[in-house]
């Protein structure tokens, strides 16, 4: 009987939960604000783990990249913590990546809202000059 989740999925989930607890408590850098661990993707051979993060209240990319640099410098320490807590023979090397999906989602949402507002200004019965020229 096949399993619902692969081992890498289970390890990803465990690492995500552990890092969400450990980073606020153990990484004491004043430049690092609140960190959200959005996802963890572990390779099939358990050698590498990409940790996708965002920072609460940070909207500009340079500050986010500074936070990513801090986390990547602390990745060795965090990796040893993961090894201790999860008792794994092979512990993935952690690579922190700034997750832009939430920002992209907000941009798309604002574009949709703008298009809806524009459609309300021009009901379907109205035709713009461009549409009228095409029918001549």
UniProtKB/Swiss-Prot annotation:
Subcellular localization, as worded in the UniProt entry: Cytoplasm
GO biological process: maturation of SSU-rRNA
Role: One of several proteins that assist in the late maturation steps of the functional core of the 30S ribosomal subunit. Associates with free 30S ribosomal subunits (but not with 30S subunits that are part of 70S ribosomes or polysomes). Required for efficient processing of 16S rRNA. May interact with the 5'-terminal helix region of 16S rRNA.
Sequence similarity: Belongs to the RbfA family.
UniProt xrefs under PROSITE patterns: RBFA
SUPFAM superfamilies: Ribosome-binding factor A, RbfA
Subunit comment: Monomer. Binds 30S ribosomal subunits, but not 50S ribosomal subunits or 70S ribosomes.
Molecular function per GO: ribosomal small subunit binding
Keyword Disulfide bond: no
Chain ranges passing through the membrane: none
Gene from which the chain derives: rbfA
Keyword Transport: no
Family annotation (InterPro entries): KH_dom-like_a/b, RbfA, RbfA_dom_sf, Ribosome-bd_factorA_CS
UniProt protein name: Ribosome-binding factor A
GO cellular component, one term: cytosol
Pfam families according to UniProt: RBFA
Coiled coil: none
UniProt entry keywords in alphabetical sequence: Cytoplasm, Ribosome biogenesis
HAMAP family documented for this protein: RbfA
Primary location: cytoplasm
Superkingdom classification of source: Bacteria
